[in-house]
């Protein structure tokens, strides 16, 4: 798998941005210019005199309590409670479908003996006998009739201390409250054409969705929550619910303030966050009954969704913090089932989701204030994971669930394969949910949390909907991008920095566990993927890709790209094909430099060893051009470099391109490459060692230089990560099948990982030898 940076070099597709050329020209020529900078240019920091901004308020997420609204007559939507808040006794609400139901509610003050009172109901004076024997509570009484000229009957009284009442149309019925607070309950009346019932209110009221009925009942039994106690609450006309233009929209850009160079923009956005968990399951060596680790690891996810008719491309990174370590030990015998450590997230854990999309809001996210977010919750449920034992019934981990609740939002930086992105980090607190998790066929059961074994439960992603708002300081000219502090850093003492960085990198080799390096090295890596996990804060990472490409343009590898075809054909044609070379048999050891044995070759290239090494030095480029599916040496180089960059504290945007370029050329200097022809393999290294052998028996056969040169031109070239010496040793000691041999010859990462997880000493030692060469 050729690294991405080399693929671009091979196609001559590397480019230099015009802005970079202008920057270089500007660094060699200075000119005095006087401008009117405006109030923001007196300091390198963001201005501290911020404007007042605008408080966003949209209907993306439905409020629990909407109101208060003024008395009015309207047809309430089905499935919404009207919470009535009267201030005086009398008729508070009336409603009818004009067919078979006329219903009104009367409020009676405390301590009223039985008496007749006159009420105006549906425009008609009605004599109704009422009473309220309570000394402290108010009494709500429903009066109803089924014909227009019929008599009213009284129903469902509610004795209330908070003096609140509610009515709702839903499911073919009209629902109300009855009983006595604080234990009031709901009741209902049947009505045809219930959805056409018009309501007339004679007091202020609120609107509560049916999904929040428990809140409505809480208000009825207790009281309304205190709302903005320091301000006067003015009830609005109900028509205000329909005046969307008077509110800040869900997706809107608002100019808060503006000067000659800068302006403050408020961005309101709906967002759909999709994320998934990733995990790492490592099996211990031995007989196959033990697992060493089941852990969470960060997971990237890219997706598209529609926002206000526009397709948005988004990128999320999900990570967890505060994991709880559990273990299971079935016994001390080699055949006892053991999990040394498995991670579980619970109520003391946090989930972080970094979110970025390609909208205008994220283009200039450098100087930001008034950042706020409102997100829904989501429940994450674990699935089953089978522990495949060699013999006996398999234990399996099942269940577990947590709910994620928004706990804040901050700015963050995501490192993708190409650039760093200023993004939003949403923090979620956790609550444990049903069901609990267990390891079936063991004693472990009834534990709560979400284990790392199968956190996605077969889902492609989890989804959270919500919105965010922020005010960002951006250039007044929309074509400009906000400058980042490190993008204009002067390169001072660069060689000293590089020297210190080399020393630090090589010293880190003693601190990084070899198992960690092997685990990462066996992942298919592109050269730029090393940026995906850099922990150092590099504000100018957007320009790193361009800087690395510039370095490669001047490197020895890139300089030979343009003459790749000619070099290969020249190397192949310059190989002497005399009979003395072709007659060299298998009696010549594959590990012997035959230059001392062959003296009668009159060609300028004096031996098979130097001939094959001449070709093999160019095989690296040939391999990248042929795009084999396995791993290559550069993948291991990138993995080691990435791990060291992760742990480095001296990394800077100036030195990183130099380190990347130097590492790509100097890591793993002793390389070997192979071509496969049916069941025969021809292998040659940069050190002049060469050999040919059969796949099924690993029997050495004569090395045909002419055949090798022809195959190099026409066939895919593969990195010999597991070389012939290692393959033969593995076959002699363990025995491997033909398919396994082909997979190892192709450097299949999955097969290599299987051998590593089984703690195979021969394969592990070979990978360690390659990693140990990675020095700067």
From Swiss-Prot:
In group A rotaviruses, VP4 defines the P serotype. Some rotavirus strains are neuraminidase-sensitive and require sialic acid to attach to the cell surface. Some rotavirus strains are integrin-dependent. Some rotavirus strains depend on ganglioside for their entry into the host cell. Hsp70 also seems to be involved in the entry of some strains. Residues 484-511 form a coiled coil. GO terms for biological process: permeabilization of host organelle membrane involved in viral entry into host cell; virion attachment to host cell. The record marks 231-232, 241-242, 247-248 as: Cleavage. Disulfide bonds join 203-216, 318-380. The lineage of its organism: Viruses, Riboviria, Orthornavirae, Duplornaviricota, Resentoviricetes. Belongs to the rotavirus VP4 family. This is Outer capsid protein VP4. The record marks 101, 190 as: Binding to sialic acid.
């Amino acid at each position: 798998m050729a690294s991405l940076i080399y693929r671009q070099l091979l196609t001559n597709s590397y480019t230099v941005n015009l802005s970079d050329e202008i920057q270089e020209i500007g660094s060699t020529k200075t000119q005095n210019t006087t401008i009117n900078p405006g109030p923001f240019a007196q300091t390198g920091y963001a201005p501290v005199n911020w404007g007042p901004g605008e408080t966003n308020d949209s209907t993306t997420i439905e409020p629990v309590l909407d109101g208060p609204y003024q008395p009015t007559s309207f047809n309430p939507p089905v499935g919404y409670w009207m919470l009535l808040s009267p201030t005086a006794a009398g008729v508070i609400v009336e409603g009818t479908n004009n067919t078979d139901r006329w219903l009104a509610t009367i409020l009676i003050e405390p301590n009223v003996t039985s008496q007749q009172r006159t009420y105006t109901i549906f425009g008609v004076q009605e004599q109704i006998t009422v009473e309220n024997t309570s000394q402290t509570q108010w009494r709500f009484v429903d009066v109803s009739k089924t014909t227009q000229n019929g008599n009213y009957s009284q129903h469902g009284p509610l004795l209330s201390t908070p003096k609140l009442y509610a009515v709702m149309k839903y499911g073919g019925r009209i629902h109300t409250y009855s009983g006595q607070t604080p234990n009031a309950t709901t009741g209902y009346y049947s009505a045809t054409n219930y959805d056409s019932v018009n309501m007339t209110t004679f007091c202020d009221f609120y609107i509560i969705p049916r999904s929040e009925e428990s809140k409505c009942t809480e208000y009825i039994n207790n009281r309304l929550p205190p709302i903005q106690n320091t301000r006067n609450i003015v009830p609005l006309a109900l028509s205000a619910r329909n005046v969307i233009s008077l509110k800040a929209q869900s997706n809107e850009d608002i100019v808060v303030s503006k000067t000659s160079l800068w302006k403050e923009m408020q961005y309101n956005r709906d967002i759909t966050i999709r994320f998934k968990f990733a995990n790492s399951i490592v099996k211990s060596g031995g007989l196959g009954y033990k697992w060493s680790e089941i852990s969470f690891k960060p997971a990237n996810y890219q997706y598209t969704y529609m926002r206000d008719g526009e397709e948005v491309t988004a990128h999320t990174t999900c990570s967890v913090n505060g994991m709880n370590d559990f273990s299971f030990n079935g016994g001390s015998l080699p055949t006892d089932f053991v999990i040394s450590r498995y991670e579980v997230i619970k109520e003391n854990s946090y989930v972080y989701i970094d979110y970025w999309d390609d909208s205008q809001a994220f283009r200039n996210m450098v100087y930001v204030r008034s950042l706020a977010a409102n997100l829904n919750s989501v429940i994450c449920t674990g699935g089953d994971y089978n522990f495949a034992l060699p013999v006996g019934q398999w234990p399996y981990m099942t269940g577990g669930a947590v709910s994620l609740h928004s706990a804040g939002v901050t700015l963050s930086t995501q490192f993708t394969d190409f650039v760093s992105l200023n993004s939003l980090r949403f923090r979620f607190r956790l609550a444990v949910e049903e069901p609990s998790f267990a390891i079936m066929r063991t004693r472990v059961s009834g534990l709560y949390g979400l284990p790392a074994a199968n956190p996605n439960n077969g889902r492609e992603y989890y989804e959270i909907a919500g919105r965010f708002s922020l005010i960002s300081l951006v250039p007044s000219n929309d074509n400009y991008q906000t400058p980042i502090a490190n993008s204009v850093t002067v390169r001072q003492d660069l060689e000293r920095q590089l020297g210190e960085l080399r020393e630090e990198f090589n010293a880190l080799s003693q601190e990084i566990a070899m198992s960690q390096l092997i685990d990462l090295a066996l992942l298919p890596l592109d050269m730029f993927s090393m940026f995906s996990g850099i922990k150092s804060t590099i504000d100018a990472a957007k320009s790193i890709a361009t800087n690395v490409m510039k370095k490669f343009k001047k490197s020895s590898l890139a300089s030979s790209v343009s003459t790749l075809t000619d070099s290969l054909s020249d190397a192949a044609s310059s190989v002497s094909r005399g009979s003395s070379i072709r007659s060299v048999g298998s009696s010549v050891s594959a590990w012997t430099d035959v230059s001392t044995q062959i003296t009668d070759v009159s060609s300028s290239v004096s031996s098979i060893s130097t001939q094959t090494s001449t070709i093999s030095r160019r095989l690296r480029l040939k391999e990248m051009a042929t795009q084999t599916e396995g791993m290559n040496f550069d993948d291991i180089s990138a993995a080691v470099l990435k791990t060291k960059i992760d742990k480095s504290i001296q990394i800077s945007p100036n030195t990183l391109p130099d380190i990347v370029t130097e590492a790509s050329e100097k890591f793993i200097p002793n390389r070997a490459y192979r071509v496969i022809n049916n069941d025969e393999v021809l292998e040659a290294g940069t050190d002049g060692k060469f050999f040919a052998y059969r796949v099924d028996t690993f029997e050495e056969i004569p090395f045909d230089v002419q055949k090798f040169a022809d195959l190099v031109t026409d066939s895919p070239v593969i990195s010999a990560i597991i070389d012939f010496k290692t393959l033969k040793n593995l076959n002699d000691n363990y025995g491997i099948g033909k398919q396994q041999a082909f997979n190892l010859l192709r450097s299949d990462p999955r097969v290599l990982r299987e051998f590593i997880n089984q703690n195979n000493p021969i394969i592990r030692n070979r990978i360690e030898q390659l990693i140990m060469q990675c020095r700067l």
